[in-house]
Amino acid sequence: MTYLLGIDGGGTRTTTCLSTGTGKILARAVVGPTNPLKVGFEATERELLRAAREVLRRARLAGVVPGLSPAGSGGAPKVTFESVCVGLAGVDRPQVHGRLFHWLRRAIPARHHWLTSDADIALRAAIGHSPGVIVISGTGSIAYGRDDRGRVLRAGGWGVPFDDCGSGYDLGRKAIIAALRDYDGRGPYTQLTQKVCRALKIPDITQVVLKRLTPKDVAALFPLVLDAARRRDAVALALCDEAGRNLAELAVTLLRRMGWLRRVIPVVYAGGVFRASLRIRRSVTRHLRRYAPQARILLLRHPPVEGALTLARELAES
Protein backbone atom coordinates (compact mmCIF):
# COMPACT_ATOMS: atom_id res chain seq x y z
CA MET A 1 0.00 0.00 0.00
CA THR A 2 1.13 3.56 -0.73
CA TYR A 3 1.48 5.91 2.23
CA LEU A 4 1.67 9.71 2.13
CA LEU A 5 2.87 12.02 4.89
CA GLY A 6 1.88 15.68 5.21
CA ILE A 7 3.24 18.05 7.84
CA ASP A 8 2.22 21.61 8.70
CA GLY A 9 4.70 23.33 11.01
CA GLY A 10 4.51 26.76 12.63
CA GLY A 11 5.66 28.79 15.57
CA THR A 12 3.18 27.26 18.02
CA ARG A 13 2.53 23.67 16.97
CA THR A 14 3.07 21.13 14.21
CA THR A 15 0.28 19.02 12.74
CA THR A 16 1.01 15.86 10.80
CA CYS A 17 -1.29 13.59 8.83
CA LEU A 18 -0.82 10.13 7.33
CA SER A 19 -2.96 8.92 4.45
CA THR A 20 -3.14 6.18 1.87
CA GLY A 21 -2.33 6.97 -1.73
CA THR A 22 -6.04 7.43 -2.44
CA GLY A 23 -6.37 10.09 0.25
CA LYS A 24 -7.91 8.08 3.09
CA ILE A 25 -6.74 9.62 6.38
CA LEU A 26 -5.21 7.01 8.67
CA ALA A 27 -4.00 9.14 11.58
CA ARG A 28 -3.24 12.67 12.76
CA ALA A 29 -0.84 13.94 15.42
CA VAL A 30 0.18 17.27 16.93
CA VAL A 31 3.63 18.05 18.35
CA GLY A 32 5.62 21.18 19.22
CA PRO A 33 6.72 24.16 17.08
CA THR A 34 8.94 23.75 14.01
CA ASN A 35 9.79 27.26 12.82
CA PRO A 36 13.59 27.06 12.44
CA LEU A 37 13.96 30.84 12.69
CA LYS A 38 12.29 30.84 16.11
CA VAL A 39 13.17 27.52 17.74
CA GLY A 40 16.35 26.67 15.82
CA PHE A 41 17.27 23.85 13.45
CA GLU A 42 17.87 21.17 16.08
CA ALA A 43 14.51 21.68 17.78
CA THR A 44 12.78 21.78 14.39
CA GLU A 45 14.38 18.53 13.25
CA ARG A 46 13.61 16.86 16.57
CA GLU A 47 9.92 17.78 16.39
CA LEU A 48 9.60 16.74 12.74
CA LEU A 49 10.95 13.30 13.62
CA ARG A 50 8.62 13.15 16.58
CA ALA A 51 5.70 14.08 14.31
CA ALA A 52 6.47 11.25 11.88
CA ARG A 53 6.92 8.72 14.66
CA GLU A 54 3.76 9.74 16.47
CA VAL A 55 1.50 9.59 13.42
CA LEU A 56 2.82 6.14 12.53
CA ARG A 57 2.30 4.98 16.10
CA ARG A 58 -1.28 6.22 16.04
CA ALA A 59 -1.88 4.41 12.76
CA ARG A 60 -0.40 1.25 14.32
CA LEU A 61 2.24 1.11 11.62
CA ALA A 62 5.99 0.75 11.84
CA GLY A 63 8.10 2.85 9.54
CA VAL A 64 11.64 3.62 8.55
CA VAL A 65 11.74 6.76 10.68
CA PRO A 66 14.59 6.42 13.21
CA GLY A 67 13.38 5.50 16.66
CA LEU A 68 10.26 3.64 15.54
CA SER A 69 10.89 -0.07 15.10
CA PRO A 70 8.41 -2.81 14.27
CA ALA A 71 8.78 -4.14 17.80
CA GLY A 72 7.82 -0.72 19.15
CA SER A 73 4.66 -0.79 17.11
CA GLY A 74 3.22 -4.06 18.27
CA GLY A 75 4.52 -6.10 15.33
CA ALA A 76 2.74 -3.86 12.82
CA PRO A 77 3.74 -4.15 9.16
CA LYS A 78 6.74 -2.07 8.23
CA VAL A 79 5.96 0.66 5.70
CA THR A 80 7.82 3.32 3.77
CA PHE A 81 6.46 6.61 2.49
CA GLU A 82 5.75 7.13 -1.17
CA SER A 83 6.01 10.88 -0.69
CA VAL A 84 6.47 13.39 2.11
CA CYS A 85 5.41 17.04 1.93
CA VAL A 86 6.39 19.43 4.71
CA GLY A 87 5.16 23.02 4.94
CA LEU A 88 7.08 25.10 7.48
CA ALA A 89 7.21 28.72 8.51
CA GLY A 90 10.58 30.29 7.72
CA VAL A 91 11.79 27.94 4.97
CA ASP A 92 11.49 30.35 2.05
CA ARG A 93 15.00 31.62 2.87
CA PRO A 94 17.33 29.63 0.54
CA GLN A 95 19.89 28.81 3.23
CA VAL A 96 17.18 27.55 5.58
CA HIS A 97 15.45 25.53 2.86
CA GLY A 98 18.68 23.92 1.68
CA ARG A 99 19.73 22.73 5.11
CA LEU A 100 16.31 21.37 6.11
CA PHE A 101 15.63 19.72 2.76
CA HIS A 102 18.96 17.89 2.93
CA TRP A 103 18.13 16.75 6.47
CA LEU A 104 14.58 15.73 5.48
CA ARG A 105 15.79 13.43 2.71
CA ARG A 106 18.14 11.65 5.10
CA ALA A 107 15.89 11.52 8.17
CA ILE A 108 12.53 10.51 6.69
CA PRO A 109 13.10 8.15 3.75
CA ALA A 110 10.59 8.35 0.90
CA ARG A 111 10.54 8.16 -2.89
CA HIS A 112 9.62 11.84 -3.13
CA HIS A 113 10.22 14.79 -0.80
CA TRP A 114 8.85 18.32 -0.97
CA LEU A 115 9.64 21.17 1.43
CA THR A 116 7.71 24.41 1.12
CA SER A 117 6.26 27.19 3.26
CA ASP A 118 3.31 26.85 5.60
CA ALA A 119 1.62 29.60 3.59
CA ASP A 120 1.92 27.54 0.39
CA ILE A 121 0.18 24.49 1.83
CA ALA A 122 -2.50 26.66 3.45
CA LEU A 123 -3.27 28.34 0.12
CA ARG A 124 -3.33 24.92 -1.55
CA ALA A 125 -5.78 23.66 1.08
CA ALA A 126 -8.01 26.68 0.50
CA ILE A 127 -8.16 27.08 -3.28
CA GLY A 128 -6.10 24.30 -4.86
CA HIS A 129 -4.12 25.49 -7.88
CA SER A 130 -6.28 28.59 -8.46
CA PRO A 131 -4.71 32.05 -8.27
CA GLY A 132 -5.30 33.92 -5.03
CA VAL A 133 -3.88 35.41 -1.85
CA ILE A 134 -3.76 34.07 1.69
CA VAL A 135 -3.14 36.17 4.79
CA ILE A 136 -1.97 34.19 7.82
CA SER A 137 -2.00 35.58 11.34
CA GLY A 138 -0.91 33.23 14.08
CA THR A 139 2.20 33.57 16.21
CA GLY A 140 3.54 35.54 13.23
CA SER A 141 1.96 37.01 10.11
CA ILE A 142 2.52 36.81 6.35
CA ALA A 143 0.69 37.19 3.04
CA TYR A 144 1.36 34.77 0.21
CA GLY A 145 -0.02 34.86 -3.30
CA ARG A 146 0.04 32.84 -6.50
CA ASP A 147 -0.87 34.36 -9.88
CA ASP A 148 -2.33 32.81 -13.05
CA ARG A 149 1.10 31.67 -14.23
CA GLY A 150 2.00 30.04 -10.93
CA ARG A 151 4.34 32.86 -9.93
CA VAL A 152 4.59 33.21 -6.15
CA LEU A 153 4.85 36.47 -4.20
CA ARG A 154 4.96 37.22 -0.49
CA ALA A 155 4.71 40.20 1.83
CA GLY A 156 5.62 40.39 5.51
CA GLY A 157 6.59 37.43 7.61
CA TRP A 158 10.07 38.73 8.36
CA GLY A 159 9.84 37.67 11.98
CA VAL A 160 10.51 39.00 15.44
CA PRO A 161 11.58 41.70 16.26
CA PHE A 162 11.35 43.38 12.87
CA ASP A 163 7.94 42.42 11.50
CA ASP A 164 4.90 40.14 12.06
CA CYS A 165 2.49 43.09 12.26
CA GLY A 166 -1.06 42.06 13.14
CA SER A 167 0.05 38.71 14.54
CA GLY A 168 -0.59 37.17 17.93
CA TYR A 169 2.93 38.20 18.94
CA ASP A 170 2.32 41.77 17.79
CA LEU A 171 -0.95 42.02 19.73
CA GLY A 172 0.66 40.56 22.85
CA ARG A 173 3.64 42.92 22.61
CA LYS A 174 1.38 45.94 22.17
CA ALA A 175 -0.74 44.84 25.12
CA ILE A 176 2.38 44.97 27.31
CA ILE A 177 3.35 48.36 25.88
CA ALA A 178 -0.15 49.72 26.53
CA ALA A 179 -0.02 48.45 30.12
CA LEU A 180 3.35 50.11 30.73
CA ARG A 181 2.08 53.38 29.27
CA ASP A 182 -0.97 53.15 31.51
CA TYR A 183 1.26 52.63 34.55
CA ASP A 184 3.43 55.66 33.69
CA GLY A 185 0.53 57.92 32.85
CA ARG A 186 1.83 58.34 29.29
CA GLY A 187 -1.19 56.51 27.95
CA PRO A 188 -4.84 56.02 28.86
CA TYR A 189 -6.20 53.58 31.42
CA THR A 190 -6.68 50.09 30.04
CA GLN A 191 -7.98 46.82 31.41
CA LEU A 192 -4.94 45.22 29.80
CA THR A 193 -2.73 46.29 32.70
CA GLN A 194 -4.54 44.07 35.18
CA LYS A 195 -5.07 41.29 32.64
CA VAL A 196 -1.39 41.09 31.70
CA CYS A 197 -0.31 41.11 35.36
CA ARG A 198 -2.74 38.31 36.17
CA ALA A 199 -1.70 36.23 33.15
CA LEU A 200 2.02 36.58 33.91
CA LYS A 201 1.52 36.23 37.68
CA ILE A 202 3.34 39.45 38.52
CA PRO A 203 2.33 41.95 41.24
CA ASP A 204 2.58 44.99 38.97
CA ILE A 205 3.35 45.64 35.32
CA THR A 206 6.86 46.97 36.00
CA GLN A 207 7.90 43.40 36.83
CA VAL A 208 7.34 42.38 33.20
CA VAL A 209 10.86 43.55 32.36
CA LEU A 210 12.23 40.84 34.67
CA LYS A 211 10.33 38.06 32.92
CA ARG A 212 12.23 36.11 30.29
CA LEU A 213 9.39 36.06 27.81
CA THR A 214 9.77 34.17 24.55
CA PRO A 215 7.89 35.24 21.41
CA LYS A 216 5.52 32.33 22.06
CA ASP A 217 4.89 33.64 25.60
CA VAL A 218 4.12 37.10 24.24
CA ALA A 219 1.85 35.73 21.51
CA ALA A 220 -0.10 33.80 24.17
CA LEU A 221 -1.27 37.17 25.54
CA PHE A 222 -3.25 38.14 22.44
CA PRO A 223 -6.55 36.66 23.75
CA LEU A 224 -6.35 39.25 26.54
CA VAL A 225 -6.68 41.97 23.91
CA LEU A 226 -9.72 40.25 22.41
CA ASP A 227 -11.35 39.88 25.83
CA ALA A 228 -10.72 43.52 26.73
CA ALA A 229 -12.13 44.59 23.36
CA ARG A 230 -15.31 42.62 24.04
CA ARG A 231 -15.57 44.63 27.26
CA ARG A 232 -15.30 47.85 25.22
CA ASP A 233 -11.82 48.79 26.42
CA ALA A 234 -10.81 51.69 24.15
CA VAL A 235 -7.14 50.70 23.98
CA ALA A 236 -7.92 47.09 23.10
CA LEU A 237 -10.44 48.17 20.47
CA ALA A 238 -7.79 50.37 18.87
CA LEU A 239 -5.27 47.52 18.90
CA CYS A 240 -7.74 45.20 17.15
CA ASP A 241 -8.42 47.79 14.47
CA GLU A 242 -4.70 48.42 14.02
CA ALA A 243 -4.11 44.68 13.60
CA GLY A 244 -6.85 44.60 10.97
CA ARG A 245 -5.28 47.50 9.10
CA ASN A 246 -1.83 45.87 9.19
CA LEU A 247 -3.13 42.53 7.92
CA ALA A 248 -5.16 44.20 5.18
CA GLU A 249 -2.01 46.03 4.10
CA LEU A 250 -0.29 42.68 3.53
CA ALA A 251 -3.07 41.52 1.22
CA VAL A 252 -3.37 44.86 -0.59
CA THR A 253 0.38 44.90 -1.22
CA LEU A 254 0.23 41.57 -3.06
CA LEU A 255 -2.97 42.43 -4.92
CA ARG A 256 -1.37 45.65 -6.13
CA ARG A 257 1.85 43.92 -7.22
CA MET A 258 -0.21 41.35 -9.14
CA GLY A 259 -2.48 43.97 -10.70
CA TRP A 260 -5.54 42.49 -9.00
CA LEU A 261 -7.02 45.42 -7.05
CA ARG A 262 -10.07 45.54 -9.35
CA ARG A 263 -10.35 41.83 -9.99
CA VAL A 264 -12.59 39.23 -8.35
CA ILE A 265 -9.95 37.15 -6.60
CA PRO A 266 -10.03 34.99 -3.46
CA VAL A 267 -8.35 36.41 -0.36
CA VAL A 268 -8.15 33.73 2.32
CA TYR A 269 -7.85 34.40 6.06
CA ALA A 270 -5.98 31.76 8.06
CA GLY A 271 -4.34 31.29 11.44
CA GLY A 272 -5.22 31.46 15.11
CA VAL A 273 -5.88 35.21 15.27
CA PHE A 274 -8.43 35.04 12.45
CA ARG A 275 -10.10 32.00 13.98
CA ALA A 276 -10.30 33.64 17.39
CA SER A 277 -11.59 37.08 16.46
CA LEU A 278 -14.58 38.05 14.35
CA ARG A 279 -13.75 41.66 15.24
CA ILE A 280 -10.32 41.47 13.62
CA ARG A 281 -11.71 39.63 10.58
CA ARG A 282 -14.22 42.43 10.10
CA SER A 283 -11.52 45.05 10.55
CA VAL A 284 -9.30 43.41 7.92
CA THR A 285 -12.20 43.20 5.48
CA ARG A 286 -13.20 46.83 6.04
CA HIS A 287 -9.69 48.12 5.35
CA LEU A 288 -9.15 45.68 2.47
CA ARG A 289 -12.31 46.67 0.63
CA ARG A 290 -11.20 50.30 0.48
CA TYR A 291 -8.57 49.20 -2.06
CA ALA A 292 -9.87 45.89 -3.41
CA PRO A 293 -13.68 46.13 -3.38
CA GLN A 294 -14.15 42.97 -5.47
CA ALA A 295 -11.95 40.69 -3.38
CA ARG A 296 -13.74 37.45 -2.48
CA ILE A 297 -13.13 36.95 1.24
CA LEU A 298 -12.80 33.37 2.51
CA LEU A 299 -11.99 31.93 5.93
CA LEU A 300 -9.78 28.85 5.65
CA ARG A 301 -12.06 25.85 6.26
CA HIS A 302 -9.64 23.00 5.66
CA PRO A 303 -6.56 22.50 7.83
CA PRO A 304 -3.32 23.44 6.03
CA VAL A 305 -1.97 19.92 6.56
CA GLU A 306 -4.54 18.77 3.98
CA GLY A 307 -2.77 21.03 1.48
CA ALA A 308 0.46 19.22 2.33
CA LEU A 309 -1.23 15.87 1.69
CA THR A 310 -2.55 17.14 -1.64
CA LEU A 311 0.98 18.07 -2.69
CA ALA A 312 2.27 14.70 -1.46
CA ARG A 313 -0.35 12.91 -3.56
CA GLU A 314 0.57 14.98 -6.63
CA LEU A 315 4.22 14.08 -6.11
CA ALA A 316 3.35 10.39 -5.90
CA GLU A 317 1.37 10.59 -9.13
CA SER A 318 3.99 12.57 -11.06
Predicted regions and their residues:
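Long C-terminal interaction/binding lobes of large macromolecular proteins
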Residues: 86
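Phosphate-binding/catalytic loop of phosphoryl-transfer enzymes
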Residues: 91-189
